[in-house]
Amino acid sequence: MILIKNAYVKTMAGADLKNGCVLIGDDGKIAGVGEDLSAPEAEIVDAGGRLVTPGCVEAHCHTGLRDLNVADYNEKSDPITPHLRAIDAIHPQDEYFSDAVRGGVTTVCTGPGSTNVVGGTFAAVKTFGVRVDKMVVKDPVAMKCAFGHNPKNAFGNAGKKQPYTRMAIAMLLRDLLTRAKTYQEEKDSGKNPKYDAKLEAMLPVMRKEIPLKAHAHRADDILTAVRIAKEFGLKMTLDHCTEGHLIAEELAEEGYPALVGPTLGGKSKMELFNKTFDTPGVLHKAGLKVCIITDAGVIPIQFLPMCAGLAASRGLPMEEAWRAITVNPAEVMGIADRVGTLEPGKDADVVIWTADPLTTIGGEAYMTFIDGKLAWKKGN
């Protein structure tokens, strides 16, 4: 057992504890959180008054799916590949995982890029381990789809095949969903349709077991994603949602979570010209559930807390900024029973910070525990 004491504990499940303790059990779970915990048999870690929080949760990235020569997150042979699974390409020795641990990020939702109209499934994994099967928190988490520039550029412009236009992107997605709906109905009615790997992969989406994970920057693309999700009665997250602040009232009526980012960086294409750190605050004020994302490696994953802090500096309340990188993404991913807060019974993913990383330049992880194991200590 490990007892972290003399800490300012932000549990994300209630009031902060100004002189708090976190007890980590031998089973890798949180055994207790409070102001006066005693465990004579435990190893003592004196936090020295430092901030202690749950491990940060990244809701959208491509960590572990890269290669020095050819990235493993975009399968450019076909614009429709729902039968691909991120877990089959995740490389636990990718240095981005080490960066995440050093940055206090303990769980990531990682998966296919945005080249394809439908790219395959994302998985939620811990950032510490050597075998991906043992790092998985949930698989699948969501089905990636993409709107706008990227599919057009990858296939229409470069590949000389559909989609050339936004019309074709919507058509290809609708066609897949229509065929998947028919396939589902046949299976549910006891018929035995010919096996189709793509349609089989879409069944969890059609049954609302997992959401579409919709890459959309421009306001019209965001609303096209909403229109299609409503047509088929699907769950969905709005990933990037770069111009979401321009249509906040419309999005509030729909209620889909917004996963905002990557905002730290340049405006490399026209879809990003209205990119601003104002977006999370505007969407939160309108009533949306907001997560902050890095889209790593677009932004280094260790900058996730910094991005939340910058959003807080532009109108997102500080407590909501913390929620946007802890409990909110955990809830959106369907893993809040394990991560996102410091509560007894949850995974012991705990970070001791040198200073509050949302308010202090240079605030970084001093110690990072994942599943109760010390994964990082500054200076070691």
Regions found by a protein language model. Give the residues of each.
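C-terminal cap of metal-dependent C-N hydrolases
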Residues: 4-11, 18, 331, 343-380
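Polyanionic/metal-chelating signatures
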Residues: 103-223, 227-236
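Conserved beta-strand scaffold positions in the cores of enzyme catalytic domains, especially
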Residues: 3, 42-46, 142, 368
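Metal-associated gating/positioning segment near the N- to mid-region
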Residues: 50-112, 116-117
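Active-site core of metal-dependent hydrolases
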Residues: 86, 184-276, 291, 331-333, ...
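Histidine-rich, glycine-flanked metal-binding segment
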Residues: 9-53
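Divalent metal-coordination and catalytic microenvironments
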Residues: 7, 22, 28, 49, ...
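His/Asp/Glu-enriched, well-ordered alpha-helical/loop segment
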Residues: 68, 75-77, 81-82, 211, ...
